[in-house]
A protein has these predicted regions:
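Juxtamembrane cytosolic amphipathic helices that cap and anchor the N-termini
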Residues: 7-16, 207-221
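Extracytoplasmic
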Residues: 12-46, 64-67, 232-237
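Residue-level signature of mid-helix packing/kink "hotspots" within the transmembrane helices
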Residues: 29, 57-65, 150-151, 258-266
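Conserved MFS/SLC helix-loop-helix module at the cytosolic interface between two early adjacent transmembrane helices
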Residues: 62-100
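Cytoplasmic helix-loop-helix junction between adjacent transmembrane helices
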Residues: 107-144
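Helix-loop-helix hairpin linking two adjacent transmembrane segments in secondary transporters
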Residues: 142-189
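Flexible cytoplasmic inter-helical loops of multi-pass small-molecule transporters
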Residues: 188-204
Length: 274
Protein backbone atom coordinates (compact mmCIF):
# COMPACT_ATOMS: atom_id res chain seq x y z
CA UNK A 1 0.00 0.00 0.00
CA UNK A 2 2.79 2.38 0.93
CA UNK A 3 4.62 1.53 -2.27
CA UNK A 4 1.54 2.37 -4.33
CA UNK A 5 1.19 5.73 -2.61
CA UNK A 6 4.84 6.54 -3.24
CA UNK A 7 4.49 5.68 -6.93
CA UNK A 8 1.19 7.50 -7.55
CA UNK A 9 1.26 10.53 -9.83
CA UNK A 10 -1.58 12.71 -8.53
CA UNK A 11 -0.43 13.11 -4.95
CA UNK A 12 -1.74 15.76 -2.53
CA UNK A 13 1.59 17.56 -2.96
CA UNK A 14 1.13 17.71 -6.74
CA UNK A 15 -2.44 19.00 -6.43
CA UNK A 16 -1.59 21.60 -3.77
CA UNK A 17 1.48 22.80 -5.67
CA UNK A 18 -0.50 23.07 -8.90
CA UNK A 19 -3.22 25.12 -7.19
CA UNK A 20 -0.69 27.50 -5.63
CA UNK A 21 0.92 28.14 -9.02
CA UNK A 22 -2.42 28.41 -10.81
CA UNK A 23 -3.75 31.02 -8.36
CA UNK A 24 -0.49 32.96 -8.16
CA UNK A 25 0.01 33.22 -11.91
CA UNK A 26 -3.68 33.86 -12.55
CA UNK A 27 -3.35 37.02 -10.47
CA UNK A 28 0.02 37.96 -11.95
CA UNK A 29 -1.34 37.80 -15.52
CA UNK A 30 -4.05 40.39 -14.75
CA UNK A 31 -1.87 43.41 -13.99
CA UNK A 32 -2.01 44.67 -17.58
CA UNK A 33 -5.79 45.05 -17.22
CA UNK A 34 -5.30 47.63 -14.47
CA UNK A 35 -3.28 50.07 -16.59
CA UNK A 36 -6.23 52.01 -17.99
CA UNK A 37 -8.43 52.01 -14.82
CA UNK A 38 -5.55 53.28 -12.67
CA UNK A 39 -4.41 55.81 -15.27
CA UNK A 40 -7.96 57.16 -15.65
CA UNK A 41 -8.52 57.26 -11.89
CA UNK A 42 -5.39 59.32 -11.15
CA UNK A 43 -5.02 61.01 -14.57
CA UNK A 44 -1.58 59.47 -15.08
CA UNK A 45 0.14 58.37 -18.24
CA UNK A 46 -0.13 54.62 -18.73
CA UNK A 47 3.65 54.43 -18.61
CA UNK A 48 3.59 55.04 -14.84
CA UNK A 49 1.85 51.77 -14.01
CA UNK A 50 3.53 49.87 -16.84
CA UNK A 51 6.84 50.82 -15.21
CA UNK A 52 5.51 49.30 -11.98
CA UNK A 53 4.79 46.06 -13.85
CA UNK A 54 8.31 46.11 -15.31
CA UNK A 55 9.77 46.58 -11.83
CA UNK A 56 7.63 43.69 -10.63
CA UNK A 57 9.14 41.40 -13.26
CA UNK A 58 12.67 42.49 -12.38
CA UNK A 59 11.99 41.89 -8.68
CA UNK A 60 10.62 38.45 -9.54
CA UNK A 61 13.83 37.59 -11.36
CA UNK A 62 16.11 39.00 -8.66
CA UNK A 63 14.08 37.39 -5.88
CA UNK A 64 14.07 33.87 -7.37
CA UNK A 65 17.66 32.90 -6.40
CA UNK A 66 17.23 34.65 -3.05
CA UNK A 67 14.14 32.61 -2.20
CA UNK A 68 15.77 29.45 -3.53
CA UNK A 69 18.63 29.98 -1.07
CA UNK A 70 16.11 30.77 1.68
CA UNK A 71 14.20 27.57 0.92
CA UNK A 72 17.40 25.54 0.96
CA UNK A 73 18.31 26.85 4.40
CA UNK A 74 14.96 27.22 6.17
CA UNK A 75 12.64 24.95 4.21
CA UNK A 76 10.44 25.20 1.14
CA UNK A 77 7.19 25.66 3.03
CA UNK A 78 8.55 28.64 4.95
CA UNK A 79 9.77 30.19 1.70
CA UNK A 80 6.40 29.69 -0.01
CA UNK A 81 4.50 31.03 3.01
CA UNK A 82 6.70 34.13 3.12
CA UNK A 83 6.22 34.59 -0.63
CA UNK A 84 2.44 34.41 -0.35
CA UNK A 85 2.44 36.90 2.54
CA UNK A 86 4.57 39.38 0.56
CA UNK A 87 2.38 38.83 -2.51
CA UNK A 88 -0.86 39.49 -0.61
CA UNK A 89 0.62 42.42 1.33
CA UNK A 90 1.94 44.11 -1.80
CA UNK A 91 -1.37 43.76 -3.64
CA UNK A 92 -3.44 44.88 -0.65
CA UNK A 93 -1.38 48.02 0.02
CA UNK A 94 -1.43 48.77 -3.72
CA UNK A 95 -5.21 49.11 -3.45
CA UNK A 96 -4.63 52.24 -1.33
CA UNK A 97 -1.61 53.62 -3.22
CA UNK A 98 -2.16 57.04 -4.77
CA UNK A 99 1.17 57.89 -6.41
CA UNK A 100 3.18 56.28 -9.22
CA UNK A 101 6.18 55.90 -6.92
CA UNK A 102 4.19 53.97 -4.32
CA UNK A 103 2.82 51.58 -6.95
CA UNK A 104 6.31 51.07 -8.34
CA UNK A 105 7.77 50.41 -4.88
CA UNK A 106 4.97 48.03 -3.91
CA UNK A 107 5.50 46.04 -7.08
CA UNK A 108 8.96 45.20 -5.76
CA UNK A 109 7.14 43.52 -2.87
CA UNK A 110 4.77 41.81 -5.28
CA UNK A 111 7.65 40.61 -7.46
CA UNK A 112 9.42 39.09 -4.47
CA UNK A 113 6.13 37.48 -3.48
CA UNK A 114 5.86 35.86 -6.91
CA UNK A 115 9.45 34.63 -6.58
CA UNK A 116 8.74 33.06 -3.20
CA UNK A 117 5.49 31.38 -4.19
CA UNK A 118 6.33 30.65 -7.81
CA UNK A 119 7.91 27.90 -9.86
CA UNK A 120 11.23 27.57 -8.00
CA UNK A 121 10.13 26.59 -4.48
CA UNK A 122 6.93 24.81 -5.54
CA UNK A 123 8.54 22.65 -8.23
CA UNK A 124 11.32 21.74 -5.81
CA UNK A 125 8.78 20.32 -3.35
CA UNK A 126 6.81 18.50 -6.06
CA UNK A 127 9.99 17.01 -7.50
CA UNK A 128 11.15 15.67 -4.16
CA UNK A 129 7.72 14.27 -3.29
CA UNK A 130 7.34 12.37 -6.56
CA UNK A 131 8.81 9.01 -7.50
CA UNK A 132 11.63 8.90 -10.05
CA UNK A 133 9.37 7.34 -12.67
CA UNK A 134 6.73 10.09 -12.39
CA UNK A 135 8.89 13.12 -11.64
CA UNK A 136 9.13 14.57 -15.16
CA UNK A 137 5.39 14.23 -15.76
CA UNK A 138 4.55 15.64 -12.32
CA UNK A 139 6.75 18.69 -12.91
CA UNK A 140 5.17 19.16 -16.33
CA UNK A 141 1.65 19.04 -14.88
CA UNK A 142 2.54 21.52 -12.14
CA UNK A 143 4.16 23.90 -14.63
CA UNK A 144 1.13 23.64 -16.91
CA UNK A 145 -1.11 24.56 -13.96
CA UNK A 146 0.84 27.79 -13.57
CA UNK A 147 0.40 28.53 -17.27
CA UNK A 148 -3.32 27.75 -16.98
CA UNK A 149 -3.57 30.65 -14.56
CA UNK A 150 -3.11 33.01 -17.51
CA UNK A 151 -6.20 31.50 -19.12
CA UNK A 152 -8.33 31.92 -16.00
CA UNK A 153 -7.05 35.13 -14.42
CA UNK A 154 -7.66 37.87 -17.03
CA UNK A 155 -11.31 37.00 -17.81
CA UNK A 156 -12.04 36.75 -14.08
CA UNK A 157 -10.38 40.13 -13.46
CA UNK A 158 -12.30 41.69 -16.37
CA UNK A 159 -15.60 40.55 -14.86
CA UNK A 160 -14.65 42.03 -11.48
CA UNK A 161 -13.49 45.31 -13.06
CA UNK A 162 -16.84 45.65 -14.81
CA UNK A 163 -18.72 45.67 -11.50
CA UNK A 164 -16.31 47.26 -9.01
CA UNK A 165 -13.36 49.69 -8.87
CA UNK A 166 -9.80 48.47 -9.45
CA UNK A 167 -8.90 48.98 -5.78
CA UNK A 168 -11.61 46.53 -4.69
CA UNK A 169 -10.34 43.96 -7.20
CA UNK A 170 -6.85 44.31 -5.71
CA UNK A 171 -8.32 43.68 -2.26
CA UNK A 172 -10.05 40.53 -3.49
CA UNK A 173 -6.82 39.28 -5.07
CA UNK A 174 -4.95 39.96 -1.82
CA UNK A 175 -7.52 37.92 0.12
CA UNK A 176 -7.27 35.06 -2.39
CA UNK A 177 -3.47 35.11 -2.11
CA UNK A 178 -3.46 34.96 1.68
CA UNK A 179 -6.07 32.17 1.70
CA UNK A 180 -3.76 30.14 -0.54
CA UNK A 181 -1.50 29.65 2.51
CA UNK A 182 -3.88 26.90 3.69
CA UNK A 183 -2.42 24.73 0.91
CA UNK A 184 1.16 25.07 2.16
CA UNK A 185 0.97 22.44 4.97
CA UNK A 186 0.13 19.84 2.31
CA UNK A 187 3.50 20.45 0.66
CA UNK A 188 5.51 17.96 2.63
CA UNK A 189 7.87 15.30 1.38
CA UNK A 190 8.65 11.88 2.80
CA UNK A 191 11.19 12.42 5.62
CA UNK A 192 12.37 8.81 5.29
CA UNK A 193 13.26 9.21 1.65
CA UNK A 194 16.97 8.95 0.91
CA UNK A 195 18.00 12.12 -0.91
CA UNK A 196 21.60 12.49 -1.98
CA UNK A 197 23.05 15.86 -1.06
CA UNK A 198 25.72 17.45 -3.19
CA UNK A 199 28.79 18.99 -1.59
CA UNK A 200 29.08 21.42 -4.51
CA UNK A 201 28.78 25.09 -3.52
CA UNK A 202 26.97 27.85 -5.41
CA UNK A 203 30.04 29.32 -7.12
CA UNK A 204 31.10 25.89 -8.44
CA UNK A 205 27.58 25.20 -9.71
CA UNK A 206 27.41 28.57 -11.50
CA UNK A 207 30.84 28.06 -13.04
CA UNK A 208 29.85 24.64 -14.32
CA UNK A 209 26.54 25.97 -15.71
CA UNK A 210 28.15 28.89 -17.54
CA UNK A 211 30.58 26.52 -19.23
CA UNK A 212 27.73 24.33 -20.47
CA UNK A 213 26.43 25.41 -23.93
CA UNK A 214 23.10 23.72 -23.22
CA UNK A 215 22.58 25.91 -20.16
CA UNK A 216 23.46 29.05 -22.14
CA UNK A 217 20.92 28.20 -24.85
CA UNK A 218 18.29 27.41 -22.23
CA UNK A 219 19.01 30.70 -20.46
CA UNK A 220 18.70 32.70 -23.70
CA UNK A 221 15.48 30.87 -24.58
CA UNK A 222 13.88 31.70 -21.24
CA UNK A 223 15.12 35.30 -21.47
CA UNK A 224 13.53 35.92 -24.87
CA UNK A 225 10.34 34.00 -24.05
CA UNK A 226 9.92 35.73 -20.69
CA UNK A 227 10.51 39.15 -22.20
CA UNK A 228 7.89 38.84 -24.91
CA UNK A 229 5.29 37.27 -22.60
CA UNK A 230 5.79 39.96 -19.96
CA UNK A 231 5.52 42.66 -22.63
CA UNK A 232 2.34 41.19 -24.13
CA UNK A 233 0.54 40.59 -20.82
CA UNK A 234 1.44 44.10 -19.62
CA UNK A 235 0.51 46.10 -22.71
CA UNK A 236 -1.77 44.06 -24.97
CA UNK A 237 -5.04 44.54 -23.03
CA UNK A 238 -4.58 48.33 -22.85
CA UNK A 239 -3.54 48.46 -26.51
CA UNK A 240 -6.69 46.62 -27.60
CA UNK A 241 -8.88 48.80 -25.39
CA UNK A 242 -7.43 52.00 -26.88
CA UNK A 243 -7.19 50.83 -30.50
CA UNK A 244 -10.57 49.10 -30.81
CA UNK A 245 -13.91 50.64 -31.63
CA UNK A 246 -16.77 50.14 -29.16
CA UNK A 247 -18.31 46.68 -29.41
CA UNK A 248 -21.71 46.83 -31.09
CA UNK A 249 -24.43 44.80 -29.40
CA UNK A 250 -25.59 41.99 -31.65
CA UNK A 251 -22.27 41.73 -33.46
CA UNK A 252 -20.35 38.45 -33.63
CA UNK A 253 -17.71 39.57 -31.10
CA UNK A 254 -20.42 40.58 -28.61
CA UNK A 255 -21.21 36.88 -28.19
CA UNK A 256 -17.98 36.35 -26.23
CA UNK A 257 -17.43 39.80 -24.67
CA UNK A 258 -19.36 43.02 -24.19
CA UNK A 259 -16.56 45.59 -23.92
CA UNK A 260 -13.11 46.28 -25.33
CA UNK A 261 -11.65 45.79 -21.84
CA UNK A 262 -13.02 42.25 -21.65
CA UNK A 263 -11.79 41.71 -25.23
CA UNK A 264 -8.27 42.50 -24.03
CA UNK A 265 -8.65 40.05 -21.16
CA UNK A 266 -9.93 37.36 -23.51
CA UNK A 267 -6.95 37.96 -25.81
CA UNK A 268 -4.49 37.37 -22.96
CA UNK A 269 -6.38 34.21 -21.98
CA UNK A 270 -6.18 32.88 -25.54
CA UNK A 271 -2.44 33.60 -25.68
CA UNK A 272 -2.02 31.65 -22.45
CA UNK A 273 -4.08 28.78 -23.86
CA UNK A 274 -1.92 28.37 -26.96
Amino acid sequence: MSSQNNNSLFTPVLIAGSLILLIGFAIRSTFGLFQIPIAEDFLWARSEFSLAIAIQNLAWGIGTPIFSAFAEKYGDRKAITLGLILYALGIFISSTATSPESHQFLNILIGFGIAGSGFGPVLAVVGRATSDSNRSLALGITTAAGSAGQVIGPPFAAILLSIMPWSSVFEIFAIISIITIILVPILKTNPNRNIQKSEENLSDALKQAIQDPTYIMLFLGFFSCGFQLAFITAHFPAFIAEASSPIIQGSLISIVCNSVASLGALSIALIGLF
